[in-house]
Amino acid sequence: LWNYILKSITRIMDYIIYRFLLIVVILATIINAQNYGVNLPITGSMDTAYANSTQSEPFLTSTLCLYYPVEASNEIADTEWKDTLSQLFLTKGWPTGSVYLKEYADIAAFSVEPQLYCDYNLVLMKYDSTQELDMSELADLILNEWLCNPMDITLYYYQQTDEANKWISMGSSCTVKVCPLNTQTLGIGCLITNPDTFETVATTEKLVITDVVDGVSHKLNVTTATCTIRNCKKLGPKENVAVIQVGGANILDITADPTTTPQTERMMAIIWKKWWQVVYPVVDYVNQIIQTMSKRSRSLNSSAFYYRV
């Protein structure tokens, strides 16, 4: 009888131990799992996700960056204008030191590795009919969250898996050429050994978002001395960024997929004449804009932010 009881206790203990070890293994697998795209070993960093802000005064513990072209400060021509603007934001509840004014030279310069430092980021972008495509690409870049890996185009062929997969090039001068390949890795309408026969998709640009036929391998040629190219996956809207289009008769459509409804959600429009007439409405409506955004979020909900002033 004693041996039977001892064996029963041993079997029960073994069962408990094995179940515990199984649970530990499963949890360890889940915790250490990486988020890979389909055939895309993309490991770039992501911002911490937050829920949409519903606080009445998120600015008391947050930072706001307002990016503006140098043209604005040149026209205003007032050495004290930033202090004035800081005092105006204070009337809306933003403490001194929580609002940062950041100047950029032009759209092309801002397109090269744009850095959005604050909890909330508002980018003033003056409309220019000669730069519509550049503006659309920049807006697509900064209004969305991307996971990217460097590409070694000298060793490998690359293909895009779906509409969210793009190749993003940045630099002082980017010329991008592509050669689609068949299943025998022979060029379709081009010779893989002769870049002059490749199809040119961009010439001497600072920002290029390349979209090719999904599921087809490509040989690429890029001016790597002045440009970097990355294999990127669009995760969804970057909800702590808003682009405020200054002027222009039409809202720019930044939708990459031509079969979908144009992406022009959440727009604000006022008649633009002078830069002070742009700045004043931004101060007036800043809290309403912030309430529709999320603090450092990459939520996959459809809520990209594109405004026009």
Swiss-Prot record:
Pfam families: VP7. Some rotavirus strains are neuraminidase-sensitive and require sialic acid to attach to the cell surface. Some rotavirus strains are integrin-dependent. Some rotavirus strains depend on ganglioside for their entry into the host cell. Hsp70 also seems to be involved in the entry of some strains. It comes from Rotavirus A (strain RVA/Cow/Canada/C486/1977/G6P6[1]). Keywords: Calcium, Capsid protein, Disulfide bond, Glycoprotein, Host endoplasmic reticulum, Host-virus interaction, Metal-binding, Outer capsid protein, Signal, T=13 icosahedral capsid protein, Virion. Calcium-binding protein that interacts with rotavirus cell receptors once the initial attachment by VP4 has been achieved. Rotavirus attachment and entry into the host cell probably involves multiple sequential contacts between the outer capsid proteins VP4 and VP7, and the cell receptors. Following entry into the host cell, low intracellular or intravesicular Ca(2+) concentration probably causes the calcium-stabilized VP7 trimers to dissociate from the virion. This step is probably necessary for the membrane-disrupting entry step and the release of VP4, which is locked onto the virion by VP7. Its main location: virion. Residues 1-33 form the signal peptide. Residues 148-150 are annotated as: CNP motif. Belongs to the rotavirus VP7 family. Glycans are attached at N52, N221, N301. InterPro entries: VP7, VP7_1, VP7_2. Coiled coil: none annotated. Disulfide bonds join C65-C118, C148-C232, C174-C227, C179-C190. GO terms for molecular function: metal ion binding. It is found in: Virion; Host endoplasmic reticulum lumen. This is Outer capsid glycoprotein VP7. Homotrimer; disulfide-linked. 2 Ca(2+) ions bound at each subunit interface in the trimer hold the trimer together. Interacts with the intermediate capsid protein VP6. Interacts with the outer capsid protein VP5*. The keyword Disulfide bond applies. One of its GO terms (cellular component) is viral outer capsid. Ca(2+) 2 binds at Q160, D211, V212, D214, D284. The keyword Coiled coil does not apply. Intramolecular disulfide bonds. Ca(2+) 1 binds at D78, G189, T197, E199.
